[in-house]
């Protein structure tokens, strides 16, 4: 037992003195200290309630704006449905049944506002917790409500614009391959900007320059999850369908949203650990005192 402890202590000192190991470990430890898994679950549940009103709003707005170009409307809409890989096929099969009238726009606006406001509130709580902003220094009413509204607007506009750019990039029309690549790259860059703005709005006392890496990692991770995570979860949904039936789709979508939320919070923790200098962290100390330097750190 003493030999195992000595080996663990040696590895602990090694990871603290090497950033390639020490920094990722500090991020994971900070994630656990903050209870970020629970925070991600709240965000995912709120997002679940916002998905379908947001989809209705997207379909209605695109139907109004692109009513004279059915081909472009169809291409953009299908590219937007890729954002829902678990239920994308079902949505594509039944998308024409959605109401594209003024009533659909009103219902979509109300449902989207209520649902995404829950996501915005949960995101504010999560990021302020992770950045260790005391509650007395967090914005109260009505400023927190105004921030939530701004987050909703940024996310909504960002979704529509990136869906449009992805539609151009994924098309096979008259535009050349260079323009399609440029459209996809621009959509990714816009996602980075959107996440930067959302993170800044959701956090009370953090500078713009401290958020760029987390925003970039979030955009990159979201694209990776859209490509690989959706496939894996769709595979699990097929296995769950025999037991849960139709509810397997709901469980699959919930799992995918949770993965997205968890990935986002991990990306935020990268910024927190980097900016707040929350590493190196000891593997054995719960007080945040590093074995390698003897310097004290805060709880996180």
For the regions a language model picked out, list residue spans one by one:
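Membrane-embedded alpha-helices and immediately adjacent juxtamembrane helical segments
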Residues: 1-300
């Amino acid at each position: 037992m003493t030999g195992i402890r000595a080996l663990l202590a040696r590895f602990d000192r090694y990871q603290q003195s090497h950033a390639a190991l020490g920094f990722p470990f500090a991020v994971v430890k900070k994630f656990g200290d903050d209870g970020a898994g629970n925070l991600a679950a709240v965000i995912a549940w709120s997002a679940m309630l916002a998905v379908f009103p947001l989809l209705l709003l997207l379909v209605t707005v695109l139907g109004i704006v692109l009513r004279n170009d059915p081909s472009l409307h169809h291409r953009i809409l299908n590219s937007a449905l890729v954002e829902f890989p678990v239920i994308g096929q079902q949505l594509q099969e039944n998308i024409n049944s959605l109401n594209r009238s003024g009533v659909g726009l009103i219902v979509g606006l109300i449902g989207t506002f209520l649902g995404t406001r829950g996501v915005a509130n949960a995101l504010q709580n999560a990021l302020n917790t992770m950045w260790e902003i005391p509650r007395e220094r967090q914005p109260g009413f009505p400023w927190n409500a105004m921030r939530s509204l701004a987050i909703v607007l940024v996310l909504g506009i960002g979704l529509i614009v990136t869906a449009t750019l992805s539609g151009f990039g994924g098309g096979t029309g008259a535009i050349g391959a260079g323009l399609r690549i440029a459209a996809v790259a621009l959509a990714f860059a816009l996602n980075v900007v959107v996440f930067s703005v959302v993170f800044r709005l959701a956090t009370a006392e953090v500078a713009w320059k401290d958020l760029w890496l987390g925003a970039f990692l979030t955009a990159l991770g979201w694209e990776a999850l859209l490509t690989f995570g959706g496939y894996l979860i769709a595979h699990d949904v097929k296995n769950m369908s025999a037991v849960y039936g139709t509810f397997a789709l709901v469980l699959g979508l919930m799992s995918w949203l949770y993965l997205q939320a968890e990935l986002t919070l991990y990306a935020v923790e990268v910024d927190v650990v980097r900016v707040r200098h929350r590493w190196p962290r000891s593997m054995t100390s719960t007080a945040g005192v590093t074995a390698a330097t003897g310097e004290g750190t805060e709880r996180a």
